Regions:
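Solvent-exposed beta-edge/loop recognition patches
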Residues: 2-184, 188-189
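A recurrent domain-boundary module in secreted/ectodomain proteins
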Residues: 183-205
Length: 205
């Protein structure tokens, strides 16, 4: 899998996520309700990790641990380069290898330009394909970036460009007797994810 960026949760200590719990990873761990004019912004002061902007264009929170940047294809971009509305693929992987030594490659058929890091697919634990919803033609499934065995479907928001408060969230499949939420994981994001403009960080439904 060709990756434009790879981040790692810090290895200075063990960061365990208990069953039914979650972590928040953001580019800017601030109270966005105080800085934005949009009612759909959230307070992210309690985020668990933050992708720090080494160029200083994004406001960072020194009290939130830094997400470790392992690789970026763009010298001027050190935080998470996510496209509002898509397209893009996001994966979680685990390996004991030295990721920094993985090979780099140009785009297929190219001999210049940005280089992508080659992630062995065998290390991928989960992934979601995020596709753009074109206002005129809808979602083009031919633009999927992940293999079907990682994500047989895709997720998308309704808006074409984002910035309208819509988020994609993984749906609750069931709830245990003690109240713990078990999330849907069929390896098909069309079934596993839904869209909301009201759900809050760390909220499940």
């Amino acid at each position: 899998i060709f990756m434009k960026q790879i981040f790692r949760i810090p290895t200075d200590k063990s960061y365990m996520v208990a069953p039914g719990q979650s972590i928040i990873i953001t580019n800017s761990a601030i109270d966005h309700t105080q800085t934005a004019m949009n009612a759909f912004e959230h307070n992210l002061l309690n985020a668990d990790f933050e992708a720090k902007d080494q160029q200083g264009k994004t406001t960072n929170n020194p009290d939130v641990p830094a997400l470790e940047l392992v690789y970026t294809a763009y010298a001027a971009i050190s935080n998470m380069n996510l496209s509002q509305g898509g397209p893009g693929g996001i994966v979680i992987f685990e390996t004991e290898e030295d990721v920094a030594n993985w090979p780099l490659a140009y785009n297929y058929g190219k001999t210049s330009g940005n280089k992508w890091m080659k992630l062995p697919a065998k290390y991928i634990l989960d992934g979601v394909d995020v596709l753009k919803n074109n206002a005129q033609t809808g979602v083009d499934a031919n633009l999927k970036r992940l293999y079907d065995y990682i994500d047989a479907g895709y997720a998308n928001i309704n808006a074409a460009n984002g910035y309208n408060g819509e988020v994609m969230y993984r749906k609750v499949q069931s709830t245990t007797e003690d109240g713990r939420k078990i999330l849907s994981d069929t390896n098909n994001s069309l079934s596993d994810f839904a869209i909301s403009s009201e759900i809050a960080p760390r909220e499940f439904k």
